[in-house]
């Protein structure tokens, strides 16, 4: 039964990822005053399927000098971890209701760094290695603020379980009392998922394509799937943390529709940011985190410790 549930979770995720690639190309197209994909199928709707067929039927090549085992393991690990992170997400019920769901997700996102590092190192290419080192530094740095912001939110929640967050936000979405945290969280998720304007790992002008420069066909597609699965997962996580998950004062009975609309709106914001902003320089990226975000999040964390005590508010599960 568990395997069936697992498949029922994985298949829709992969479908969502496939159509997110189409959505991205369409959004970017219209923002640049062009159509985007419109040949394959009606309005280009079959483009993701054509892309998948093309990628998985190509011959997978790898450099002679690469470490073959690690080279193959890295993309598999990346996709496996990206899919594993969905397990504790309440949609509306999680696959496994973990006591420490948030901690599990943090641990999994930290492990995803290894896949990037291995892929860059095993490729035995200087560009891939530079891209991988940048990705690791960026991901580890931004995880610091993500963890502190999560802690601040969980102080209002009273436990590490995600379903209780939905109960917490029944009357007031957490974006209202902690909007500075929400802004920093959103920017940190952009950096965590290696999206523009923080896509330094894939700086085409300097690093060709970043850590996956030597990958082709299937393994490249796996990295691609992992990246987009992480984007959707992060947006669902943001919805659960700050946007009241399923709650909507106007149409409270449209449970799943509310949730999907919020997550989709956030995803389109990711694409909007990509279309609008130029890439950060590496030192600006680090300066933003260590000099701006970290002091702010620490101060706000202390404020969130005091807030429930000041207002005599008891979290739903203590």
From Swiss-Prot:
Task: Tell me the PANTHER family matching this sequence.
Answer: NADH DEHYDROGENASE SUBUNIT 1, NADH-UBIQUINONE OXIDOREDUCTASE CHAIN 1
What Gene Ontology molecular-function terms does this entry list?
NADH dehydrogenase (ubiquinone) activity
| Protein name (Swiss-Prot/TrEMBL) | NADH-ubiquinone oxidoreductase chain 1
What task does this protein carry out? Answer: Core subunit of the mitochondrial membrane respiratory chain NADH dehydrogenase (Complex I) that is believed to belong to the minimal assembly required for catalysis. Complex I functions in the transfer of electrons from NADH to the respiratory chain. The immediate electron acceptor for the enzyme is believed to be ubiquinone.
What Enzyme Commission number(s) does the record list for this chain? 7.1.1.2
What biological processes does GO assign it? Answer: aerobic respiration
Q: Name one GO cellular component term.
A: mitochondrial inner membrane
Q: What is the recorded membrane topology of this protein?
A: Multi-pass membrane protein
> Which Pfam families does the record cross-reference, listed alphabetically?
NADHdh (PF00146)
Superkingdom of the organism of origin: Eukaryota
The entry assigns this protein to a family as follows: Belongs to the complex I subunit 1 family.
Q: Where in the cell is it found?
A: Mitochondrion inner membrane
Catalytic activity reported: a ubiquinone + NADH + 5 H(+)(in) = a ubiquinol + NAD(+) + 4 H(+)(out)
Transmembrane spans: 2-22, 70-90, 100-120, 147-167, 171-191, 217-237, 253-273, 294-314
Principal cellular location given in the protein's record: mitochondrion
Q: What class of enzyme is it?
A: translocase
UniProt keyword annotations, A-Z: Electron transport, Membrane, Mitochondrion, Mitochondrion inner membrane, NAD, Respiratory chain, Translocase, Transmembrane, Transmembrane helix, Transport, Ubiquinone
